[in-house]
Amino acid sequence: MSGKIPKYFITELLSRTNIIELINTRLELKKYGKNYQTNCPFHHDKTPSFTVSNEKQFYYCFGCNAHGNAIDFLIQYEHLSFIESIEELALIHGVKIPFENTVQNSIYVKKQKLYLLMEKICKLYKKNINVTHLANKYLARRGINQNMIDFFLIGFSSLKWNEFYKKINISKEFEQELLINNIIATDKNGYIYDRFQGRIIFPIQDNHGRIIGFGGRSLNDMSPKYLNSPETDIFYKRKQIYGLYQVIKKCSKPVYLLVVEGYIDVITLTQYNIDYAVSILGTSTTTEHIQLLFKNTDIIICCYDGDDAGKNAAWKTLKKALPYISDKKTLKFILLPNQEDPDTIIRKEGREKFQKRIDNAITMSKFFFKNILKNINLSSDDDKFHLSVHALPLINTISSDTIRIYLRQILARMIGILDDNQFEKFLYEKETKNTQKTYFQIKRTPMRTLIGLLVQNPSLAKLVPVTMKFKNLQIKGLSIFLEILQTCRDNPNIHTGQLLELYRNTTIINVLKILARWDHMIIQKETQNMFLDLLMNIHDKILEKRREYLIAKERKKGLQMNEKKEIWSINKKLSKR
C-alpha cells in the first residue's frame, strides 16, 4: 500500500492520532501505571489483557497476541481495509489523502463526490417535503411530528430528474457515474428518472453522519412499498444500520440497542423517547450487523412481529449472533402480538407499557431452547438424539466457556444424562476445532534486545554517536539495527506506532512487531543504561572481529600503514573497556 499513499502522509497522520483517544471511543480503557488496559475485544477475555501504550502509540494483548498501531486497530476492530482505515483517520483529522496511485485517487475523489452529491440530494428532498401536501398528510396520519422530521432529515421526492440536474448542477460525466451505480435510472424511452420519485425519503447516515444512501416509502400502491438505494462505493446494506448514528449522537455507549424492522418503527419509538431503536435495512441480519451492534452496546434486544415470519427471523438472527455472545455481550428478544409492530403497539399502549416489554425481553438461553424444542418429544429417545445432534453444534459456536457449559448443562438434563461421569464428560468435551494458536516467536539475543529497545524507544537513537563506526556488516542483525537507527535519526520525533508503519509489508515487519512488545524486565529509568551497555558490547564485538581480520591479513600478506594504525587504535579502545 505504500505505493498508493505516501509514507510521509501516513507518518504525519499517526502523529496527529492519539491511540488512547481513538480506542477509548470504542472501548473503556482504564489507566494502569503508565499504560491503559481493558478486556481484549478480539478474544474471550476474562481479565484485562489488552494493553495500550500512550508513549509508544501501540497496543498489545497478552492473551491472543493482537497488536499494532492506530491503523492496525481500525483494521482489526472495524474490519476495514488498510486504505479504509487511512480514510477513517483522515476524516477524523479533516485532511485529504494525497494518493500517489491515479486509479486509487480517482476512487477516493469519486467517493468524496458521492458524499457531496448525497448531501445535496438530501437537502433537496428535505426542502421538498415542506411544500408537498401529500407527504405532510401521510406523515401526520402516521403521527410523526416536525421534530422527528428534522432529526431524521425526512424528505420527499416528487421532482423529475431534470429538475434535480438543474438545481444540483452536476456534470454529464458524473451523471453517467450515477447511472452506472444505479442511483438514477432510465426508462424504456431513455429518459432519466429518480428511483425514489413519489416516495417519502429516509436518509441513511454512516457513523460520521454523512449521507450514504436513502430508503423510500411509497405513498400509493407503488411496488415495492419500501425501496433502498442500490449499493455503491459508499453504501453497503449488509454493513449499515438505520438510526445508529442518531442513537450514538445522544449516547456514545447505550445500555442496549433495540433492533426493529422498519424506518417508521425507529422514528416512532424515538418520538416516544425510546432513544436506542435502530433498524436493519430491509434485509436479513448479517454477521456484520451483529458485530457493529455489539461494538456499540453489550445488550441487543431484537423486536420482531409475533407471526411465523417474525419468529423465523429472530431464530436466524440468534444463530448468526451465537459466535459473538460472551459473558458481557448478549441477545434478548421481544415477540409482539400478531398484526402489531413497534409503531402501532407503542401508540396503543404508551411508552410505559412498551418499556415493560423491553424489561421483560426473553433471554438468549430461554429463546434458544424454546426454538430448539419445537416438535421435540422428550419422552422419545429418537427425539432426544435429534435434539442433541441439532443443539450441540450451535452451542459449540459460542466462545464463552461459561455460557457454552451452562447451555450444555441444560441440554444434558433434557436428554437425561444423569450419571455424574457421563455428565462431566458431556459438559467439558473438547471441541473438534483446535482453538490454540501458534505465534511466531524468536530467541532473545543481545542484538535483538538492542533493536527492541530502539523500536520501543526511538529517541534512544540520539545516544548513538555519529562517529561510532560499524564496518563489519556480517554480524547477524546489525544491518537491521543500522536501518532502524537511520530511520529514527531521519525522523527525530517518531514513536513506535509510526516506526512500525514505515516498515509495513517489508520482510522485517513481523520481527519488529515482536521486538516492539518484548518485556525487558527493567524499570523505565534503566532503559538508557541498558541500551548503551548493549551498544558498547556489540561495538566491541565489531572491533574484535575487525582486529581478527587485520591480524589474519598481516600474517598472509602484510598491512598498509593505515591498517596498522587502525589495529593500534582498536587495541587502544578495547584496552579502556
Swiss-Prot record:
Membrane-spanning intervals of the chain: none
A biological process term (GO) from this entry: DNA replication, synthesis of primer
CDD domains: TOPRIM_DnaG_primases (cd03364)
GO cellular component, one term: cytoplasm
Cofactor note as given: Binds 1 zinc ion per monomer.
InterPro entries listed in its UniProt record: DNA_helicase_N/primase_C, DNA_primase_core_N_sf, DNA_primase_DnaB-bd, DNA_primase_DnaG, DNA_primase_DnaG_DnaB-bd_dom, DNA_primase_Znf_CHC2, DnaG_bac, DNAG_N
RNA-binding in keyword set: no
Catalytic activity: ssDNA + n NTP = ssDNA/pppN(pN)n-1 hybrid + (n-1) diphosphate
EC number, UniProt record: 2.7.7.101
The Toprim domain, residue ranges: 255-337
Zinc finger (CHC2-type) stretch: 40-64
NCBIfam families assigned to the protein according to its UniProt record, in alphabetical order: dnaG
Summary of the function given for this chain in its UniProt record: RNA polymerase that catalyzes the synthesis of short RNA molecules used as primers for DNA polymerase during DNA replication.
Official protein name in the record: DNA primase
Gene: dnaG
